[in-house]
């Protein structure tokens, strides 16, 4: 389908850490990631970093909270959701979103009719304001 959300990778650190301001400050640091994510791939590009992979984002965030990691790299909505659910007491996101990844609704290859119907519904929701309401509800911020 047409994209309904644009995401990207972001860095999360302990709330009181002012030494890491973004991705460029991660050289030589301990980075926690979620297995099989683009964040795990990106962390592998950091020079002299010790990257530890976890089964889920909560475990990676706990590693940060417990002092076993200096930072977590994951998709922006994943980390922002973690912060909204109480993680903001201990952590914060820093720096700019590192890349751009569009989210869409997958349909079976060749099912052009369904894809067109989905795209039409998305366009209608954007036109009538429903998309903006849902975006704010589920992503916790205004569409930029």
Q: Across the structure, where does each feature detected by a protein language model lie?
A:
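Beta->alpha turn/N-cap motifs
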Residues: 14, 34-37, 56-57, 73-83, ...
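Periplasmic-binding protein-like
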Residues: 5-13, 80-122, 139-144
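Short helix-initiation/N-cap motifs at beta->coil->alpha
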Residues: 18, 35-38, 52-66, 100-101
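Ligand-binding clefts/hinges and TM-proximal coupling segments of bilobed small-molecule sensing domains
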Residues: 38-52, 91-94, 117-144
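Flexible hinge/capping segments at coil-to-helix
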Residues: 14-30
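Short, Asp-centered acidic motifs that coordinate Mg2+ and/or phosphate
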Residues: 30, 70-71, 104
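Short helices/loops that flank or line small-molecule/ion binding pockets
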Residues: 24-25, 45-46, 58-77, 85
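Hydrophobic residues within well-ordered alpha-helices
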Residues: 26, 64-65, 105, 118
């Amino acid at each position: 389908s047409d994209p309904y959300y644009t995401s990207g990778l972001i860095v999360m650190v302990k709330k009181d850490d002012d030494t890491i301001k973004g991705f460029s400050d991660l050289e030589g640091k301990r980075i926690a990631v979620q297995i099989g994510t683009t964040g795990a791939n990106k962390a592998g590009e950091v020079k002299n970093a010790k990257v530890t992979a976890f089964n889920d984002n909560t475990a990676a965030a706990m590693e940060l909270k417990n002092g076993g990691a200096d930072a977590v790299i994951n998709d922006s909505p994943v980390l922002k959701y973690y912060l909204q659910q109480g993680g903001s007491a201990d952590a914060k996101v820093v720096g700019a979103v590192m890349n751009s990844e569009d989210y869409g609704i997958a349909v079976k290859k060749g099912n052009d009719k369904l894809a067109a119907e989905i795209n039409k519904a998305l366009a209608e929701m954007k036109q009538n304001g429903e998309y903006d309401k849902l975006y704010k509800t589920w992503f916790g911020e205004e569409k930029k």
